[in-house]
Amino acid sequence: MADRTVFDSPSRQSTSSPSNNNPASINHRSSFAENLRHSPRAQRHPSFTQAAVQELLNHPPVPKIGDPRFAGRDWRQIHVGELVQETDIHWCELDTDVERATKALIESGPPNVILIRETPDDVTACDSFDYNDLNAYLLVVLGLANPDEEQKETYSQLASKAREHVPIPLRDVITLAKKEPLTTLSESEDLSKAVEIFGSGVHRILVCKPGTTTVVGILSQLKLVKFLWDNGSSFPAIDQLYPTILRDLNIGAQQAIAINGDKPLTEALQLMSNEGLTSIAVVDNAANVVGNISTADTKLLTHTSSLPLLQSSCIHFISVILSERGIGDGKDSFPVFHVNPYSTLAHTVAKLVATRSHRMWVVESASPSPSAPATPSLGYASVVQQPSGGGSVPPSPSFPAVSAAALPGARISGRLTGVITLSDILNLFARTTGLNPMDPNESRARRRRSSSASVRPSMDSSRGDYLDTIREMNQNNLKNIFQYRGLSMRTNNSSELEVEYKKTREIMTRPGAKFQTLLQDLLPDGGKQGMRELKWVNQDFSPPK
C-alpha cells in the first residue's frame, strides 16, 4: 500500500537494470550514480554547466514584453474567449476505447485533456479524460486500486477485460478517478471570473459560446498564469506583487505529500490516485527533495515493454523521465521544481511557467547569501506535525537509500517544508484585486476527505513507521547533545538518565547563553541550524529506554 508522507520535492535519478549474465549482479541494486553513467544522458554534453543552472535558478527569466493587444487594459475586463483557441479541443466519444483515447491524450499535448461527448456530432462535453483518469485505470488493471465493497466486481471485470485485450469504452473508465465536475464559462465573461474560480482550486474551465454549451476552448490555470506573467507590465496591480518573497505573501501550504525515492513506483501512482493529486515530491531519508513524479508521466507506462518500470523505484523512474525528456528535447534535462520561502513570487512564477508545472515544492535553503535565497527559520517539525501525517518507511537492504547529496545538482535543493500551487497564486491575485475566491486549502481538504476509507489503515500504519524513523533520528541528535554536555546515555541508573534527559529537554527548549556559545563553537554555521534542530528534536521524542 502506498505510504503517505507529508512533505515536498524537485527531480533527478537513474535507470538501467542489472545484467542477467552476471549472477553476482542479480542481487546487487545499482546506485543512482552507477546507473547514470550508462544512461543515454551520459552520452550527451549537458546544455548548461551546473554554475549556469544555478545562475538560472537565482535569476530566472524576466517576463516577456506584453502583447500590445492588452496594453493599458484592465486585466479583469479582458474576456476569457480572448485567451483560448478551438485547436486546443480534442474529442472522443463515450464508446471510444481507452487505448485510442490514451493515444489521443498523449499526442494532443497541452492542455492535457480529452473532452468526451456522447456522439461525434455533439459539441457539448459530458465528461473529460486526462492523466489522472489514465493513472486510475492503470491501477485497476494492475489490481492496485482500492475499491469499495460494491465496486470490487466492476474493478475485477475491468482488469479481466484488459488482460484479455477486450476493448474497454471510456464510459466504463471515467468514473474511476477522483475529479472535479466540469466547470464552464461563457467566452464573453471577464478574466476576473476565471481568476476567482481558479483561485478557489478549480484546475480547468471549458469556455463556451454565450448562452450555449458549445465548447470553443479550454482555459487552464497554467495558461492564465502564463498570460498574466507574460503581460505583467500591462497589469500593475499584479505586477507589483512579483518582487515580494513568498514568506511575506503567506501563501501556499505548510504540508505536502511526498514519497521516499526508494519506494516502488506503484506506491507513488497509488498515492496520487488516492489523494487526487497530479504530482508528488520524491524525497530522500532526510526529506530532501530529489525528484518529482506527475500523473502525466504515466504516458511512459502505456506500452507493454514499459511494464518492468512498475516494479522499479521512484528514483529509477525519475531517471527514465529525464532520459526520455532529454532524448525528446535533444538536450540534457535539468528540472527545477523547488523554491524556498525567500524566493520572490516572480522567481516562483517563472519556474512554474518554464517547467509547465502546477506546483513548486518549498524547501529550506542551504545558506543565506545576496545571490541565493536565505535559509528560512522553519523547523522540520512543521512538516512532521501536520494533521494528515505520512509514512516514509526505512528502506530494506535490497532498496538502499539514495542520499540527495550524492545526486547531481542535489545541493541546490533542500529539505521539504511545503508546497505552492497555481491555485495559491491565482487566489492571491484574486484577493489582491478585490475578488472573493474560496480558500484553495478547503478544496485540498475535501479531496483528502474523499479518499477511500479502505486506504486509511495503511495510511495510519505508515505514519507510525515514519514516526519511528523520526524518533531514531531524534535519538541520535539527543545523543550528540548529551555529548556536548559531557554526559553519557550509557548508564544503568534509569532515574539518573531521566533527570539528565529532562535537563537536556530544558536546554533544547530554552537554550541559555552558555549552551549557545558551545554550539557556536562546535557547529559550522555558528549554531543557527543547530538551535533549530534542537527545538525540532523536542517536538516528537520519548525518553530513551
Swiss-Prot record:
Region (Disordered): 1-27, 433-465
Domain CBS: 83-154, 177-234, 252-309, 366-438
A GO cellular-component term linked to this record: nucleus
PROSITE patterns named in the record: CBS
Signal peptide limits: none
InterPro entries: AMPK_gamma/SDS23_families (IPR050511), CBS_dom (IPR000644), CBS_dom_sf (IPR046342), Ssd23 (IPR016711)
Composition bias, Low complexity: 9-25, 451-461
Protein name: Protein sds23
Disulfide bonds: none
Family: Belongs to the SDS23 family.
One Pfam entry name: CBS
GO molecular function, one term: protein serine/threonine phosphatase inhibitor activity
Protein purpose: Involved in DNA replication and cell separation.
Localisation: Cytoplasm; Nucleus
Keyword entries, A-Z: CBS domain, Cytoplasm, Nucleus, Repeat
